[in-house]
């Protein structure tokens, strides 16, 4: 007899990613780690606040994917302080938003971003490390 863990539809295993659609500002917690967020800003600018350096846990990670083709408003992923280091490539192969040693506080999915552009973020050692890819020049930038 097969274990229910081997049955894809049993609900016992984690065969699928946990995906949520963000359309309004939200504050994420460590418990949201591992989720994939499809991001749209048709109604207003969206701010996504992550755990701070004092509340973040090592290994907490999130993925944000632009769902709306050329978002209506900016989507800002906020850290609360300059604790983010990012490696980024855009459509022209430029380093784009890469921090190159200068940490940042926010990453912005710009109104020029394309559906499928994404950012992966992980907390480690009191700071965030990020990887971002955009199919258009300057679709993702920092502040």
Predicted regions and their residues:
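Exposed extracellular interaction/assembly regions and N-terminal maturation sites
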Residues: 1-96, 123-143
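A short catalytic or substrate-binding loop motif that flags glycine-/basic-rich loops and adjacent residues
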Residues: 56, 111-113
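A conserved acidic, glycine/proline-rich C-terminal tail/linker
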Residues: 100-110
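Extracellular disulfide-bonded cysteine-rich modules/repeats
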Residues: 114-123
């Amino acid at each position: 007899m097969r274990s229910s863990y081997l049955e894809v539809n049993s609900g016992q295993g984690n065969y699928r990613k946990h995906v949520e659609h963000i359309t309004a500002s939200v504050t994420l917690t460590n418990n949201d780690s591992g989720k994939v967020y499809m991001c749209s800003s048709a109604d207003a600018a969206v701010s996504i606040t992550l755990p701070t350096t004092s509340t973040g846990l090592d290994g907490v990670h999130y993925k944000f994917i632009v769902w709306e083709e050329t978002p209506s408003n900016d989507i800002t992923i906020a850290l609360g302080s300059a604790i983010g280091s990012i490696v980024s490539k855009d459509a022209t192969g430029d380093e784009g938003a890469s921090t190159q040693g200068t940490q940042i506080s926010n990453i912005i999915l710009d109104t020029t971003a394309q559906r499928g552009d994404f950012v992966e973020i992980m907390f480690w050692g009191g700071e965030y490390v990020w990887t971002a890819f955009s199919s258009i020049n300057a679709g993702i930038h920092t502040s």
